[in-house]
Amino acid sequence: MKVLWAALLVTFLAGCQAKVEQPVESEPEPELRQQTEWQSGQPWELALGRFWDYLRWVQTLSEQVQEELLSSQVTQELTTLMDETMKELKAYKSDLEEQLSPVAEETRARLSKELQAAQARLGADMEDVRSRLVQYRGEVQAMLGQSTEELRARLASHLRKLRKRLLRDADDLQKRLAVYQAGAREGAERGVSAIRERLGPLVEQGRVRAATVGSLAGQPLQERAQAWGERLRARMEEVGSRTRDRLDEVKEQVAEVRAKLEEQAQQISLQAEAFQARLKSWFEPLVEDMQRQWAGLVEKVQAAVGASTAPVPSDNH
């Protein structure tokens, strides 16, 4: 009987243990859960997920990993993944800072300082991983030809610790970014509320103006056309009257100019006649005097010629 009870007790305990262990096995590991969140998150989280996957592969310390560690290929790949992660993280942080502009300056400075510290811790963790692998490569090269089992064991232990620290700091950074994003969203909502308060009166004025325009649009088309026609007719009459007045002014100005020109021409003609008479009074006495002198000279010449042609008396008679 005791044996039967002991068998039943063992069976019961085994069943309880199976029930207890079953949900534990079904729960995903924290690292796997975190990796799933990274793969479906922001660009910086995706880049960090690639770094995490590569680090898990390095931690296997397979023959291929050890070969690439000795050739510095692993450290180069980790450096590339680190730079990519930090670049995406800085870009995401800059976007959030732009969205935080409506938030108070003190709150924005505090959040930025906390986020900067978390970002620095994550970068230091990744740098520690890379430095530890560089150190391992140097140690292996120094022990060329000797057993490196102890070095691999120490490296595996260090990598496990670094992975836990990296996971913790990445989770902390994720939470701080979530707070940062919530603050940005709250600031954006405040900014929208302020814009609505400023634009509310303008929108109301626009609504009233639209209603006024709508009431004007409801008038009969014929009345509006007549009103426009009367305005246009009055405008044309005003323009025509101004044009006629301007033409009259131009005509008067042309007549004045013509009268002045005729007067000036008459004055010039009189001045020319007076000048001509003056010239004539100057030169007529000179001409008459020259004519008299010329006539006297001709008479003298003729007299001299006549005297020279008379016959000379002869002494023989």
UniProtKB/Swiss-Prot annotation:
* Keyword annotations from UniProtKB, A to Z: Chylomicron, Endosome, Extracellular matrix, Glycoprotein, HDL, Heparin-binding, Lipid transport, Lipid-binding, Oxidation, Phosphoprotein, Repeat, Secreted, Signal, Transport, VLDL
Q: Name one GO molecular function term.
A: heparan sulfate proteoglycan binding
Region Specificity for association with VLDL, as annotated, extends over 278-290
According to the UniProt record, where is the region LDL and other lipoprotein receptors binding?
A: 158-168
Leader sequence residues: 1-18
Q: Which residues bind heparin?
A: 162-165, 229-236
Q: Which GO terms describe its biological process?
A: acylglycerol homeostasis; cholesterol efflux; cholesterol metabolic process; chylomicron remnant clearance; high-density lipoprotein particle assembly; intermediate-density lipoprotein particle clearance; lipoprotein biosynthetic process; melanosome organization
Coarsely, its chief localization is secreted
- Free-text function comment from the UniProt entry: APOE is an apolipoprotein, a protein associating with lipid particles, that mainly functions in lipoprotein-mediated lipid transport between organs via the plasma and interstitial fluids. APOE is a core component of plasma lipoproteins and is involved in their production, conversion and clearance. Apolipoproteins are amphipathic molecules that interact both with lipids of the lipoprotein particle core and the aqueous environment of the plasma.
User: What family does this belong to?
Assistant: Belongs to the apolipoprotein A1/A4/E family.
This protein's name: Apolipoprotein E
UniProt organism field? Colobus guereza
